[in-house]
Amino acid sequence: MSILQKLENSAAAAVKALYGTDPMEGQIQLQKTKREFKGHLTLVVFPFVKMSRKSPEATATEIGEWLLANESAVSAIEVVKGFLNLTIAPRVWLELLNEIRADINFGHKVATEDSPLVMVEYSSPNTNKPLHLGHVRNNLLGYSLSEIMKANGYRVVKTNIVNDRGIHICKSMLAWQKWGDGVTPEKAGKKGDHLIGDFYVLFDKHYKAELNSLMAEGKSKEEAEAASTLMAEAREMLRLWEAGDEKVVDLWRTMNQWVYDGFDATYKMMGVDFDKIYYESETYLVGKEEVLRGLEEGLFVKHSDGSVWADLTKDGLDEKLLLRADGTSVYMTQDIGTAKMRFNDYPINRMIYVVGNEQNYHFQVLSILLDRLGFEFGKGLVHFSYGMVELPEGKMKSREGTVVDADDLMDEMIRTAAEIAAEAGKAAEMDEEESREVARIVGLGSLKYFILKVDPRKNMTFNPKESIDFNGNTGSFVQYTYARIRSLMRRAEAAGYDIPSQLPTDLPLSEKEEALIQKVSEYAEVVSEAGHSYSPALIANYIYDLVKEYNQFYHDFSVLKEEDERIRAFRLALSEVVALTMRKGFALLGIEMPERM
């Protein structure tokens, strides 16, 4: 039982003993005491004033005196208006530190075969271009959320839906046919996803030129788009693909495999993975079957042009297209099919979609349509909606070829980390291989931390230069502190200093040492809240606060030079626990820790 839970129970017992009634749920409010006051935890007394029929100050004093007499964990009290500040006895903090050290899974719950199963969808790339900065935020959020849910005791299936079919894929295929001259990734000397992305950009370049030519002849933009032969060819290629044309399907398979090979390399570098990958080419037919079933059952309507729609006006929305007039499907069709397949494949208790906030309407509609089709799971879908990410230069547009590729960004971060380390002389004692590995860990860690420390629901600007800074709220600052603690522990081991498995509980502690133990003990609560609110940012910012407190402690107190053997062992044990907590927290963010920097 945590100190917080223990004192919540004792406060409830105090209210019952003093005022003859049990407090209602939520009335016991314990929070961390503000720095300007004495104490560790503060009880809000206002909810009990009606019971006591006394002033807030008198009520706080009564409850505080009862706790002093009946709860040995409380060593002192201070009343400030309607707030009761409680000081916890040093013995309790040392007992807690021993408990944390003994529990290798502290802060994490271990799933069993009976634990609820959560499926988390993230990444969802198109096979017509490489992953870009927007995908980086998506992948990092999805992976981190999955790890956080695991730490909260859930069984987790990480899944990816690859958008491997559709008009956008046909644009790249058509451009390769027309202007590719048989080029392959090997011939071009580049990753397959980048090569296919080049042809997507090339299609758009020729398409715009065609539109400009048609508009120069006097056509409006709409008329030019309708008259475009290039777009007509792309649509015909899509029709042939859906009809199973052998040549088109063979080309599609070949070019998609080039892209998959490229994606795999990017995912490996990024440090994300998946338990199950679905492909739109396999799920959209299931979706079409469901839409046609809904049409037969009168759930949907067919317009005069042959297109199929869902009328959502009774749900406060508008009409939603489900099948085009030519019978081809849309994203919604595929998502219906994918959802059905997933719930057939796994006993899912919660389905979480990690998708940007521009798709809020889409998932609102998907939930309604699945429910209308008779799937009970439709009501329980969770859209983890996150904000857009940009660079200081502005927005990214893949059609114009100005997108920031994930591969290029990661390479730049690793190079920058290596350069900064070299300038600071931090890599002087390392050989070339270790220097490269540390640069990789720090560069990617800085990228991940900078993105994940931001509230996922907010838009953000990623600044590569700001993200690698050995001071301030950055991943590299945390990693440097971790490496310093590991160096401290190696020196302690070399000096033969022993740390007993159980520390004595009669040691004198300073306020800063108590506060640091308290901060470590909050890890479990933060992990729980991060899972409840789907927020990796809570983990990131907690670790940063922990690091700040540790650095202040390290600045103010001797560790290796402490002459009192028992105090030295305590401070080493505390340092070790802080480092372990940092590593566990960063692992939930997908960030590695270097042993040296």
Curated annotation (Swiss-Prot):
Protein localization: Cytoplasm
Coiled-coil residues: none
Catalytic activity, as annotated: tRNA(Arg) + L-arginine + ATP = L-arginyl-tRNA(Arg) + AMP + diphosphate
A single cellular component GO annotation: cytoplasm
GO molecular function annotation: arginine-tRNA ligase activity; ATP binding
UniProt keyword list: Aminoacyl-tRNA synthetase, ATP-binding, Cytoplasm, Ligase, Nucleotide-binding, Protein biosynthesis
Keyword Oxidoreductase attributed: no
EC number, as in UniProt: 6.1.1.19
Main location: cytoplasm
Motif 'HIGH' region: chain residues: 125-135
GO biological process per UniProt: arginyl-tRNA aminoacylation
Family to which the UniProt record says this protein belongs: Belongs to the class-I aminoacyl-tRNA synthetase family.
Subunit structure: Monomer.
Entry-linked PANTHER family: ARGININE--TRNA LIGASE, CYTOPLASMIC, ARGINYL-TRNA SYNTHETASE
Protein name (Swiss-Prot/TrEMBL): Arginine--tRNA ligase
Organism: Porphyromonas gingivalis (strain ATCC BAA-308 / W83)
